[in-house]
């Protein structure tokens, strides 16, 4: 009898575990969707039920072999499996309180961010060269693997590098600082080099497939905008560039929603050279315009301080006050500035 109760309890927990996190696309087959249609969805880059539920109907109709009637049926079934309706602010507040935050390696910076880099949203870091953007990314790629009680995310990291600045030896130095095995840390980081804007977007489809297979806590794109500056030039291509960038950022946001990963992107700055620049306190502004400004949940502005110190300012956030914190770039990653 006790054995039977134990088995029932185990069955309950497995059902509960299934209801949390993304559901594999194969679940749609149990809802009466043709296996061939599910395969077509998977080939088009939809690996979870959530991905289908969040997609506009137009996107499904564009898939070869999916008619409007089929798209309607697929979306109806996906909506039954994914809660997408209204909820009370109390429930949402409860969910928000359970959000994991990943430590940056600096206590001052964590205090500024009220715990660290938030999972399930996009954090954008922008600043000139040599302000610590890539160094924070390298440190986060290690700290996201720490246990939750040590400020980690207990998951793997994914690193899309568009500028060729990824250095595994930096990860080893940070791993040593936290007492982690260097080889394990490197095994838990999936790295890809992005060569052009289309390839950069294609990598997100691969990322989605990998996130279904394994638990990832962090997705880094360093830098999200570098390739857009070279692939699209002049004002004539501006609208095409912004549309492509908007699509890329939308996919990032969808990955953050679907898998609850922390998405960290770095952005470059441009100097204002118009007449108004003379009166601006700081004539540098992030590139990507309003599209990237609206897509990022939290925007951090990094600038140089004295020596090895850097200053991080909350540039835009829905819940953090506009404030600054000082941090340092040390041999073992990002840390606190010494007075």
From Swiss-Prot:
The modification Phosphotyrosine is found at residue 54. Ubiquitinated by the SCF(FBH1) E3 ubiquitin ligase complex, regulating RAD51 subcellular location and preventing its association with DNA. Ubiquitinated by RFWD3 in response to DNA damage: ubiquitination leads to degradation by the proteasome, promoting homologous recombination. The keyword Phosphoprotein applies. Residues 48-77 form the HhH domain. There is a cross-link at residues 58, 64 (Glycyl lysine isopeptide (Lys-Gly) (interchain with G-Cter in ubiquitin)). One of its GO terms (cellular component) is site of double-strand break. It is found in: Nucleus; Cytoplasm; Cytoplasm, Perinuclear region; Mitochondrion matrix. InterPro entries: AAA+_ATPase (IPR003593), DNA_recomb/repair_Rad51 (IPR011941), DNA_recomb/repair_Rad51_C (IPR013632), DNA_recomb/repair_RecA-like (IPR016467), DNA_repair_Rad51/TF_NusA_a-hlx (IPR010995), P-loop_NTPase (IPR027417), RecA_ATP-bd (IPR020588), RecA_monomer-monomer_interface (IPR020587). Residues 184-257 are annotated as: Interaction with PALB2. PROSITE patterns: RECA_2 (PS50162), RECA_3 (PS50163). The modification N-acetylalanine is found at residue 2. The modification Phosphoserine is found at residue 14. Keywords: Acetylation, ATP-binding, Chromosome, Cytoplasm, Cytoskeleton, DNA damage, DNA recombination, DNA repair, DNA-binding, Isopeptide bond, Mitochondrion, Nucleotide-binding, Nucleus, Phosphoprotein, Ubl conjugation. One of its GO terms (molecular function) is DNA polymerase binding. Gene3D superfamilies: 5' to 3' exonuclease, C-terminal subdomain, P-loop containing nucleotide triphosphate hydrolases. ATP binds at residues 127-134. Forms linear homooligomers, giving rise to a RAD51 nucleoprotein filament, which is essential for strand-pairing reactions during DNA recombination. Interacts with BRCA1 and either directly or indirectly with p53. Interacts with XRCC3, RAD54L and RAD54B. Interacts with the BCDX2 subcomplex RAD51C:RAD51B. Component of the homologous recombination repair (HR) complex composed of ERCC5/XPG, BRCA2, PALB2, DSS1 and RAD51. Interacts directly with PALB2 which may serve as a scaffold for a HR complex containing PALB2, BRCA2, RAD51C, RAD51 and XRCC3. Interacts with RAD51AP1 and RAD51AP2. This is DNA repair protein RAD51 homolog 1. It comes from Bos taurus. The gene is RAD51.
């Amino acid at each position: 009898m006790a054995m039977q109760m134990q088995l029932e309890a185990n069955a309950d927990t497995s059902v509960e575990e299934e209801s949390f996190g993304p559901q594999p696309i194969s679940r749609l087959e149990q809802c009466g969707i043709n296996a061939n249609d599910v395969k077509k969805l998977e080939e088009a880059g939809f690996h979870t039920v959530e991905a289908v539920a969040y997609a506009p109907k137009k996107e499904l109709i564009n898939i070869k072999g999916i008619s409007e009637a089929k798209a309607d049926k697929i979306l109806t079934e996906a909506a039954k499996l994914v809660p997408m309706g209204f909820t009370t602010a109390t429930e949402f507040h409860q969910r928000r309180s359970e959000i994991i935050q990943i430590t940056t390696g600096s206590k001052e910076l964590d205090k500024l961010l009220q715990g660290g880099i938030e999972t399930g949203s996009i954090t954008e870091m922008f600043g000139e060269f040599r302000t610590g953007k890539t160094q924070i990314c390298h440190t986060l790629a290690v700290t996201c693997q720490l246990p939750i009680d040590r400020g980690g995310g207990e998951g793997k990291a994914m690193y899309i590098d568009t500028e060729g600045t990824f250095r595994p030896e930096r990860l080893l130095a940070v791993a040593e600082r936290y007492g982690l095995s260097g080889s394990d840390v490197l095994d838990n980081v999936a790295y890809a080099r992005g060569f052009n804007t289309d390839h950069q977007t294609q990598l997100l489809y691969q990322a989605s497939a990998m996130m279904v297979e394994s638990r990832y806590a962090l997705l880094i794109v360093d830098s999200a905008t570098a390739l857009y500056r070279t692939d699209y030039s002049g004002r004539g291509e501006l609208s095409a560039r912004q549309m492509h960038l908007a699509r890329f950022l939308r996919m990032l946001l969808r990955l953050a929603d679907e898998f609850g990963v922390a998405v960290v992107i770095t952005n470059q700055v441009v100097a204002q050279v118009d007449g108004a620049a003379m009166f601006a306190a700081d004539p540098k502004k992030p590139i990507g315009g309003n599209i990237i400004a609206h897509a990022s949940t939290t925007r951090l502005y990094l600038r140089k301080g004295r020596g090895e110190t850097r200053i991080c300012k909350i540039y835009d956030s829905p819940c953090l006050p506009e404030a600054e914190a000082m941090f340092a770039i040390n041999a073992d990653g990002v840390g606190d500035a010494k007075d």
